[in-house]
Amino acid sequence: MRRSIILVSVSVAIAMLTGASIAEAEPMPPNNPSAATRDALWKIVHDRCELGYQHTGAYAPCTLVDEQAGTALFKANYDPNQYLLLPLARVTGIEDPALQELASPNYLYNAWAARGFVSSRLNNSLPEPDIFLAINPKNARTQDQLHIHISCVSPTTAEILKQVNWAEYVGWKPLPVTLQDHTYQALAVNRSTFESKSLFRDIQTKVTADGNTMDHASVAVANIAPDQFLLLVAEGTEDQAIAAEELQDHNCSIAKRLTGQLDMETRR
């Protein structure tokens, strides 16, 4: 059920912006994709956001267009706090060879740099470790334009990651417990490395060394200590899709819980 909600959410947001009906935008089964539907997000970011910005200077329907960085930021209307970071270039997804080029923009860090947009929707009360990035694989997404989900971490995921000692992950190593019943490999990355290089080459090296393909790789990034991040990769199969977005909570209940705790302390 959770995966079905994830697959539909982006399509519903697109339908709201394009004026299409939900039925028209709802994805086909992953093994029988509708090309027209799966290109909807690309058409929005290219035809409307980028070209519109070039002609009028306005970002709409995106929140931001950054031609220098080669990215756009798109508010997912169907979810209250989620944003999507998208390339302005045609990049289909995590499996696209363009992400392996040395000159490829640092999309993951650009997504992290946009975290303030999520926090601002929560009165700027969200600590950085509560913000979480996720990329779904080809068979667990509805759109064939790379989009990085920027949202809140789920409380369950947060509790597990609090127990992780980043110093133990200087090389790839599986987390000691599963996340949403899936095994994730983890690699610690400091802020300087995260900011200065694209991590997609490291991800592909790991995935291919394990005998798997990027088509089925699911990726997430968490901030687990000051200036320390954890790169997470789950390797699914054609028959078993793993969506890293499952580790997020677009309702941001973790922020509401924090706000409630602060209110209680204020009353004391």
From Swiss-Prot:
Pfam families cross-referenced by the UniProt entry: CDH
Listed GO biological process terms: CDP-diacylglycerol catabolic process; phospholipid biosynthetic process
E.C. code: 3.6.1.26
Subcellular location, record wording: Cell membrane
Catalytic activity: a CDP-1,2-diacyl-sn-glycerol + H2O = a 1,2-diacyl-sn-glycero-3-phosphate + CMP + 2 H(+)
This protein's UniProt keywords: Cell membrane, Hydrolase, Lipid biosynthesis, Lipid metabolism, Membrane, Phospholipid biosynthesis, Phospholipid metabolism, Transmembrane, Transmembrane helix
GO molecular-function terms, A-Z: CDP-diacylglycerol diphosphatase activity
UniProt keyword annotation of DNA damage present: no
Chief location of this protein within or outside the cell: membrane
TM helices/strands, residue ranges: 5-23
Cellular compartments per GO CC: plasma membrane
Membrane topology, record value: Single-pass membrane protein
Pathway stated in the Swiss-Prot or TrEMBL entry: Phospholipid metabolism; CDP-diacylglycerol degradation; phosphatidate from CDP-diacylglycerol: step 1/1
Family the entry assigns: Belongs to the Cdh family.
Name of the protein this chain belongs to: Probable CDP-diacylglycerol pyrophosphatase
Organism: Mycobacterium leprae (strain TN)
Lineage of the organism: Bacteria, Bacillati, Actinomycetota, Actinomycetes, Mycobacteriales
